[in-house]
Amino acid sequence: MHTAWQEILKEEKEKDYFIRLWDFVKTAYRETTVYPPKDRIFHAFDAVAPQDVRCVILGQDPYHGPNQANGLSFSVNDGVAIPPSLRNMYKELMSDLGCPAPTTGNLEAWSNQGVFLLNTSLTVEAGKAGSHAKKGWESFTDRVIEVLGQQEQPIVFILWGNHAKSKKSLIDTNRHLVLESVHPSPLSASRGFFGSRPYSQTNDWLQQQNRTPIDWCIS
């Protein structure tokens, strides 16, 4: 975790709920198979300090299949099949910006440019979607969203689906841009995700705010 995040979240990690959460997580890793790998739980916080975040893409759960989750929302490791929601994100990326088809599902290239890829739950038991929800992670990640929402520099928050949209109240919408649509999941993508142009909208707004746009194309 970047030192700036460590400092900001130090008090949060000392709260009773987080101590209980962390006890639960440690036990879960010991007794069951949990994703992502333990050293990747806070990977989203490694690459980018809060003051350098330009865009937040909010996910829900880590992937719950082998070798998929790497601590960044929607991202998978190199060499792993690109999951359906991410495939749809890429389809929209190609349509929106004319990017070539990405060959990897690894989104480190976005993270390294200040795209904060945050799940609202940071761990999950293998094969059991949502299994670590309501254990305390949401309180922790709500605090993270609040911290980002209080940053001086303007940030784009991308909220896909009802779960992500429910976090809008944590964000100062006078200072930041919130882009909302249905989730890129195959179940909903055709109902308003395709054609929503989140990538170009993000860059247009960042440039209006005198911030550097993001190179979204993934080679």
From Swiss-Prot:
Keyword Transit peptide (UniProt): no
Keywords from the UniProt entry: Cytoplasm, DNA damage, DNA repair, Hydrolase
GO cellular component, one term: cytoplasm
Broad class of the protein's primary localization: cytoplasm
Reaction(s) this enzyme catalyzes, per UniProt: Hydrolyzes single-stranded DNA or mismatched double-stranded DNA and polynucleotides, releasing free uracil
Keyword Acetylation: no
Catalytic residue positions: D61
Any GO BP: base-excision repair, AP site formation via deaminated base removal
InterPro entries assigned: UDG_fam1, Uracil-DNA_glycosylase-like, Uracil-DNA_glycosylase-like_sf
Known EC number: 3.2.2.27
Molecular function in Gene Ontology: uracil DNA N-glycosylase activity
Functional description taken from the UniProt entry: Excises uracil residues from the DNA which can arise as a result of misincorporation of dUMP residues by DNA polymerase or due to deamination of cytosine.
Family: Belongs to the uracil-DNA glycosylase (UDG) superfamily. UNG family.
Name of the featured protein: Uracil-DNA glycosylase
Organismal lineage: Bacteria, Bacillati, Bacillota, Bacilli, Bacillales
Gene name as annotated: ung
